[in-house]
Amino acid sequence: MIRNSTKPAKAAPGKAKTTPKAAKSAATSSKATGTAQAVKASPAKGLGKGVIAVAPPSFRRERALIKRGIWPVAGCDEAGRGPLAGPVVAAAVVLDPKRVPKGLDDSKRLSAEKREELFEEICASAQVSVACASPERINRDNILRASLWALTRAVHALPDLPQHVFVDGRDRLATRCESEAVIGGDGLIASIAAASIIAKVTRDRLMCRLAQDCPGYGFEQHKGYGVPEHLAALARLGPSVHHRRFFAPVAAAWQKIEGAPAEPTGLTGDLFGTPADSGHAATL
């Protein structure tokens, strides 16, 4: 054990005399020290707790490109990377500069009712396309590659191929036009925010249809995410053809059962009336 060998200094013997001038000086010094300590201890005015305002997405970056003669400009985003079941749905949107819907925001910040309202407004005023990567493709390629594939297909399915596309996230797309990755883009760029709404609403509607195809899992409630109710159903019923086989909870459920599910029913591929495959794109 190491002990501190430093001893406190002993007070000088006797009682020190204090003159009125010295007492006044000491009091002033003590007051100043106390004030300095109080300032140091308390936060500066206006730096306490407060609400951080978040500006909504704007059309500013699209307009900057338009002024340079670059048009059409699209935004794209996906919904459904995290769930244990169902497809990834990607959307691409070219907004009309004269009819940018008010209230656009990251779909995760909006209520279901507001998303539905904006979905209809976006479809009525903008060029919109969607593409789905099925659970089969996700199982085969992995979730990232399947998502990028769906995003690329959505861009190429637009009525007019854009000259520039903003994509939410870190990864650029292998599109036939210039693509720009923007981290957090669904909260910054209006076109991406619109795409996030289209993707989210489309996928939610699809999961409600899959709930009819595979009752008991509660897809219409949790949309395939790994909530306790879904995990309980997965343990009780085993994986369905719409589950992503290599996601950990699904893989664990597979280990407890024998055999394999039938091939996908084609419901995912038939959403827009196109032949079933491992994914597809359509214009809304």
Curated annotation (Swiss-Prot):
<comment type="function">
    <text>Endonuclease that specifically degrades the RNA of RNA-DNA hybrids.</text>
</comment>
<dbReference type="GO" id="GO:0005737">
    <property type="term" value="C:cytoplasm"/>
</dbReference>
<dbReference type="GO" id="GO:0003723">
    <property type="term" value="F:RNA binding"/>
</dbReference>
<dbReference type="InterPro" id="IPR024567">
    <property type="entry name" value="RNase_HII/HIII_dom"/>
</dbReference>
<feature type="region of interest" description="Disordered">
    <location>
        <begin position="265"/>
        <end position="284"/>
    </location>
</feature>
<keyword id="KW-0378">Hydrolase</keyword>
<dbReference type="InterPro" id="IPR012337">
    <property type="entry name" value="RNaseH-like_sf"/>
</dbReference>
<dbReference type="InterPro" id="IPR001352">
    <property type="entry name" value="RNase_HII/HIII"/>
</dbReference>
<dbReference type="InterPro" id="IPR036397">
    <property type="entry name" value="RNaseH_sf"/>
</dbReference>
<feature type="region of interest" description="Disordered">
    <location>
        <begin position="1"/>
        <end position="40"/>
    </location>
</feature>
<dbReference type="GO" id="GO:0032299">
    <property type="term" value="C:ribonuclease H2 complex"/>
</dbReference>
<comment type="similarity">
    <text>Belongs to the RNase HII family.</text>
</comment>
<keyword id="KW-0479">Metal-binding</keyword>
<feature type="compositionally biased region" description="Low complexity">
    <location>
        <begin position="1"/>
        <end position="36"/>
    </location>
</feature>
<feature type="binding site">
    <location>
        <position position="78"/>
    </location>
    <ligand>
        <name>a divalent metal cation</name>
    </ligand>
</feature>
<feature type="binding site">
    <location>
        <position position="168"/>
    </location>
    <ligand>
        <name>a divalent metal cation</name>
    </ligand>
</feature>
<dbReference type="Pfam" id="PF01351">
    <property type="entry name" value="RNase_HII"/>
</dbReference>
<dbReference type="GO" id="GO:0006298">
    <property type="term" value="P:mismatch repair"/>
</dbReference>
<feature type="domain" description="RNase H type-2">
    <location>
        <begin position="71"/>
        <end position="259"/>
    </location>
</feature>
<dbReference type="GO" id="GO:0030145">
    <property type="term" value="F:manganese ion binding"/>
</dbReference>
<dbReference type="InterPro" id="IPR022898">
    <property type="entry name" value="RNase_HII"/>
</dbReference>
<keyword id="KW-0540">Nuclease</keyword>
<dbReference type="GO" id="GO:0043137">
    <property type="term" value="P:DNA replication, removal of RNA primer"/>
</dbReference>
<keyword id="KW-0963">Cytoplasm</keyword>
<keyword id="KW-0464">Manganese</keyword>
<feature type="binding site">
    <location>
        <position position="77"/>
    </location>
    <ligand>
        <name>a divalent metal cation</name>
    </ligand>
</feature>
<keyword id="KW-0255">Endonuclease</keyword>
<protein>
    <recommendedName>
        <fullName>Ribonuclease HII</fullName>
        <ecNumber>3.1.26.4</ecNumber>
    </recommendedName>
</protein>
<dbReference type="GO" id="GO:0004523">
    <property type="term" value="F:RNA-DNA hybrid ribonuclease activity"/>
</dbReference>
